[in-house]
Amino acid sequence: MSSGGLLLLLGLLTLWAELTPVSGQDRPVKPGLCPPRPQKPPCVKECKNDWSCRGEQKCCRYGCIYECRDPIFVK
């Protein structure tokens, strides 16, 4: 294989490796439940899914509000 073809293959593999985790659709949701709705202006969108939040936080939906919140756990 020529060096140009090898570089192209390496570039495509790198791009594929970078784009694969972005989907996040196959990942299970994080444990815990979202706490009660906060008092905030309507339609604030801080996150898209649990994996766009830091650490153990979950992406919680309250109507059109999406925000990262610490989970609560119910026994």
Curated annotation (Swiss-Prot):
Q: Name one GO molecular function term.
A: serine-type endopeptidase inhibitor activity
Spell out the InterPro entries in the cross-references. Elafin-like_sf, WAP_dom, WAP_four-disulfide_core
Task: Write out the tissue specificity statement of the associated record.
Answer: Expressed by the venom gland.
Q: Where is the WAP domain?
A: 27-72
Keyword Signal appears in the UniProt entry: yes
Q: Which domain of life is it from?
A: Eukaryota
* Pfam families given in the database record: WAP
Q: What Gene Ontology terms for biological process does this UniProt record contain?
A: antibacterial humoral response; innate immune response; venom-mediated disruption of cell wall in another organism
- PANTHER family named in the record: ANTILEUKOPROTEINASE, WHEY ACDIC PROTEIN WAP
Query: What is the protein name for this chain?
Result: Nigwaprin-a
Biological source species: Cryptophis nigrescens
